[in-house]
Design a protein with these regions (language model features):
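Exported/periplasmic ABC-transporter solute-binding proteins
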Residues: 29-47, 51-52, 56-92, 103-106, ...
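C-terminal motif of bacterial Sec signal peptides marking the signal peptidase cleavage site
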Residues: 23-27
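Periplasmic-binding protein-like
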Residues: 119-123
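Short, glycine-/small- and polar/acidic-enriched structural segments
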Residues: 142-151
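Sec-dependent signal peptide recognition
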Residues: 10-17
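Short, Lys/Arg-enriched N-terminal segments with co-localized hydrophobic residues
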Residues: 1-7
Length: 265
């Protein structure tokens, strides 16, 4: 395949970001929809500007070339991308193939720094995006806050431990969390639990996962009594996990924002 660089790649990626925001919007609840709608509008405006009111489909057709876009996305987005968003985008844009690689945002940041040939980076937190931008590896004018997520406490279906609120994580005998060293969900978990005075009390019960999907899978398999993931993760396994509660208001210093941007070629 032929890989595009510069403005052409930028416009295709921005059109993709706008479409993916719109696709995610369809599956959100009302409050999330309002947040995502604003992000969709921002991404769409950026896409229209960069593309000079063309679409990725028209651009590709005009050149007659096949284009492959590699998206490096947070592990919590894998199901949404693979099951819905990528097929939706490819159907609307013949000649453009989208491949995804998924891991914790911290690990993806490191991979991009070490030469991963990604076209688009979608992080589960602003920290990793800011770091890459400061290193000159991101097209700064393409950074868009695309989605807002929620941090939730989950338990296996049945809730045998009878947890009722976020703070009840203390009652669990085994807990799955993302590793705060590289997993944004783990960083959010540490912050919330520290602010609630719980973090130090549960350390001997915690198993740390290398990405949020590992945490979700541990709870879904009942290998852990409880875990902390994103609301979107919990929704993807609603038949195997239950949401006990969202992180309490004030326990996190900022909203859980997923930024997206084009990686410099």
């Amino acid at each position: 395949y032929k890989r595009r660089n510069g403005d052409m790649k930028k416009q295709i990626c921005l059109v993709m970001a706008a479409m993916m925001a719109a696709g995610m919007l369809a599956g959100c609840d009302r409050s999330a929809k309002e947040t995502t709608a604003a992000a969709t509008e921002a991404a769409t405006t950026a896409a229209e500007t960069a593309a000079e009111e063309t679409t990725a489909k028209e651009t590709t057709a005009a050149s007659g070339e096949e284009t492959e876009i590699l998206v490096a996305a947070a592990a919590s987005l894998k199901n949404a991308y693979e099951d819905k968003l990528i097929p939706m985008f490819e159907e609307a844009n013949p000649g453009v193939t989208v491949k995804g690689t998924y891991d914790s945002s911290g690990k993806l940041q490191t991979q991009i720094e070490e030469g991963l040939d990604a076209d688009v980076f979608m992080s589960a937190a602003k920290k990793q995006m800011i770091a890459l931008d400061e290193e000159g590896m991101i097209a700064s004018d393409t950074i868009t806050d695309l989605l807002e997520n929620k941090i939730v406490l989950i338990v296996p279906t049945g809730n045998e431990k009878k947890l009722e609120k976020f703070e009840d994580i203390e009652k669990a005998d085994s807990i799955a969390l993302g590793d705060p060293a590289s997993v944004p969900a783990g960083q959010y978990s540490e912050e919330a639990l520290t602010n609630l005075g719980i973090w130090d009390k549960i350390q001997d019960k915690v198993s740390f996962g290398t990405n949020v999907t590992e945490v979700l899978n541990q709870v879904a398999a009942a290998s852990a009594d409880a875990g902390i993931v994103y609301a979107t993760d919990a929704a993807s396994m609603a038949d195997k996990v239950e949401v006990v509660a969202e992180a309490p208001e004030g326990s996190l210093s900022e909203k859980v924002i997923y930024p997206v941007a084009v990686v410099k070629g």
